[in-house]
Amino acid sequence: MPRAILEINSERIRHNVKKLSEFSGKKVIAVIKADAYGIGSIQMAKILEPIEEVDAFAVACVEEGVELRKMGIKKEILILGGVLKDEVPLVEEYFLTPVVSDIEHLRAIGNRDIKFHVKYDTGMGRLGFLNEVIHDPRVEGIMSHLSSPADEEFSKLQIKKFEEIVKKYTKVEKIHMESSAGVVYRVPFTTHIRVGLAMYGEKPLKNYPVDIKPALTLKAKLISVKELPENYPVSYSRTYVTKKKTKTGVVAFGYADGLMKTLSNRSYLLYKGEKLPIFGNITMDMTIVDLKNTDAKVGDWVYVVNEERTFTELAREAGTIPYELMCNLSKRIKRVVV
């Protein structure tokens, strides 16, 4: 029996994707790169492939695309990170769709019968052509990426720049730019949205207008319960000392599992709705909490993330972003689709 479980609510995942599609009026390219942000790319692909709102998946590299194909995923798979020369045979064999964002990607493909999308850099300074038009019948789609979707003024400049590029193309099947946060702009000339974080019910912006619901629950077992005397040091470096006789618990979840050490002495875990303050430094495999007057006992589940606190809220406490927390989730956490 695993000591830590990440529950993925399939009904809510599908609800969120349908609401995102409904809000935008567009089909969805589901971004499941980096093992679906640490949640599980195979699990996510199998949840989403059956629904009509999802038109394709997007991953970072060829290896991620091959893995999905080997697990039976049939829908189109975009390779966001492009394609290098030695990867082209796998792209052909597994019917993957590379995103061309550098002239070397185009040269790698050569004259092979491989459809591709062209990416434009409209203000990210990362991957993408600046303004070159690729006149090639194999171009299936064109795309860009919003660098600062919370910045309305700059995002609108990017959208305008991309629109001018789009006008230079004819008969392009797929045009996409909006991310989970970017859907708020309802770009009129795109055909698809490209979303990741919001699928999990994580709201990327304040006052997010899409009706999404938290779909992830992260819980770990309580493996020890005891009472510590007053003035007793807790954890490495003795950064916490009990102020009175205190009932404490040890939870089988530490920074090796993805609970950032920056949360030591400043955050909490949850038990039956009760906030359990973290005492002392979070350690590699365990975290010590104040059990207060709860009835918690060894073997009970303690919650890191649930409906009461999302990854977005936990990330805010840790001084980071939810993507980093999710991507850092350990492989020893069992992923369970419910």
Swiss-Prot record:
Record SUPFAM superfamilies: Alanine racemase C-terminal domain-like, PLP-binding barrel
Pfam families given in the database record: Ala_racemase_C (PF00842), Ala_racemase_N (PF01168)
GO biological process entries: D-alanine biosynthetic process
Residue positions where N6-(pyridoxal phosphate)lysine is found in the record: 33
GO CC terms, sorted: cytosol
Alphabetic keyword roster: Isomerase, Pyridoxal phosphate
Binding site for substrate: 126, 284
Active-site residues annotated for this sequence: 33 (proton acceptor), 236 (proton acceptor)
The EC number(s) this enzyme carries: 5.1.1.1
Purpose of the protein: Catalyzes the interconversion of L-alanine and D-alanine. May also act on other amino acids.
Protein known as: Alanine racemase
Organism per entry: Aquifex aeolicus (strain VF5)
Phylogenetic classification of the source organism: Bacteria, Pseudomonadati, Aquificota, Aquificia, Aquificales
